[in-house]
Swiss-Prot record:
This is Cytochrome b. A ubiquinone binds at H201. The keyword Acyltransferase does not apply. Component of the ubiquinol-cytochrome c reductase complex (complex III or cytochrome b-c1 complex) that is part of the mitochondrial respiratory chain. The b-c1 complex mediates electron transfer from ubiquinol to cytochrome c. Contributes to the generation of a proton gradient across the mitochondrial membrane that is then used for ATP synthesis. The keyword Coiled coil does not apply. The gene is MT-CYB. Heme b b566 binds at H97, H196. One of its GO terms (molecular function) is ubiquinol-cytochrome-c reductase activity. Keywords: Electron transport, Heme, Iron, Membrane, Metal-binding, Mitochondrion, Mitochondrion inner membrane, Respiratory chain, Transmembrane, Transmembrane helix, Transport, Ubiquinone. Its main location: mitochondrion.
Length: 379
């Protein structure tokens, strides 16, 4: 008799995705982040659901409803801090996952890569709208500043901003719709993640060498299911350490002050995971130029498959490209740091230099170095 997991219409989908999936035998721990992102998404949906049961999306009661969750709801403080820090863990895993894709040339799977970039945009939109919900000072002013950027769009800008706000400023209508979108988007992300996996399983996983590994595949279960569970345990340990010991380490203390439209905080800045893009936005004196640079700083990821000039897929055997890759990583750390600094000398010029370097590395240096390496290898 054939095993039910191979014949049942539903179970065989799970079987071909997580049990009998042929997987390259040499994939390293860098391939763990896909499953870790799945875990982060599940944590966020579950904790978010319980928070939504007690949260009210009204400007008068939003802040106090979050206080009520932390003070009066059973383990409400834990759920709230797990949700807030879960976003940080999500982005740490996302950045490492994207970095892995860049380093090992996974972007040559066009569909998988492009859906991944769309997923990144969706997660960023969800995180931004979630940050507005507690209705603290940084929530209100962050929402005001970021939505206001759309007014830079010629002709329709102002109308578009007022349409998103549902009025002439960030107010009750804005908060209500942001809550609605923040609730629905994670389910859209989950659906997109399934499409992401579908396209990945069409081609099979990449591996550190970047070579075709059809001759050396092993079943996903038990080898990589065990490896993923180890990743889960490490992530949960680090995550719960952060939540239980320093829950406000990555947050902004200004958000413990209720939103006040009459009092602007001295330094308006987003959460740490948006700071690199925020630094690029601030580096350009022109409003429209800044917005375009901000969008393009993420959208540029879609150009990687086109800009790939190397004869080899992975950077594993390309030391010059490796060097440039780590310079890019250092540049992103610099941009993140500058995004959190006040707009004054020397941070302005440093931010501009780091922004120029970011785009130059991706658009010019990477393809040039790849062509040089081809020449050195006489290819």
């Amino acid at each position: 008799m054939t095993n039910i997991r191979k014949t049942h219409p539903l179970i065989k989908i799970v079987n071909s995705s997580f049990i009998d999936l042929p997987t390259p035998s040499n994939i390293s721990a860098w391939w763990n982040f896909g499953s870790l992102l799945g875990l982060c998404l599940i944590i966020q949906i579950v904790t978010g659901l319980f928070l939504a049961m007690h949260y009210t999306s009204d400007t008068m009661t939003a802040f106090s409803s979050v206080t009520h969750i932390c003070r009066d709801v059973n383990y409400g403080w834990l759920i709230r801090y797990m949700h807030a820090n879960g976003a940080s863990m999500f982005f740490i895993c996302l950045f490492l996952h994207v970095g892995r894709g860049l380093y090992y040339g996974s972007y040559t799977y066009f569909e998988t890569w492009n859906i991944g970039v769309i997923l990144l945009f969706a997660v960023m939109a969800t995180a931004f709208m979630g940050y507005v919900l507690p209705w603290g000072q940084m929530s209100f002013w962050g929402a005001t500043v970021i939505t206001n950027l759309l007014s830079a769009i010629p002709y329709i800008g102002t109308t578009l901003v007022e349409w998103i706000w549902g009025g002439f400023s960030v107010d009750k209508a804005t908060l209500t719709r942001f809550f609605a979108f923040h609730f629905i988007l994670p389910f859209i992300i989950a659906a997109l993640a399934m499409v992401h996996l579908l396209f990945l399983h069409e081609t099979g996983s990449n591996n550190p060498s970047g070579l075709i590994s059809d001759s050396d595949k092993i079943p996903f279960h038990p080898y990589f299911s065990i490896k993923d569970i180890l990743g889960f345990l490490i992530l949960i340990m680090l995550f719960m350490t952060l939540v239980l010991f320093t829950p406000d380490l990555l947050g902004d203390l200004d958000n413990y002050t209720p939103a006040n439209p009459l009092n602007t905080p001295p330094h308006i800045k987003p959460e740490w995971y948006f700071l690199f893009a925020y630094a690029i936005l601030r580096s350009i004196p022109n409003k429209l130029g800044g917005v375009l640079a901000l969008v393009f700083s993420i959208l540029i990821l879609m150009l990687f498959p086109i800009l790939h000039m190397a004869k080899q897929r992975s950077m594993m055997f390309r030391p010059l490209s490796q060097c440039i890759f780590w310079i890019l990583v250092a540049d992103l750390f610099t941009l993140t740091w500058i995004g959190g600094q006040p707009v004054e000398y020397p941070f302005i010029i440093m931010g501009q230099m780091a922004s120029i370097l970011y785009f130059t590395i991706i658009l010019i240096i990477f393809p040039s170095i790849s062509l040089l390496e081809n020449k050195l290898l006489k290819w």
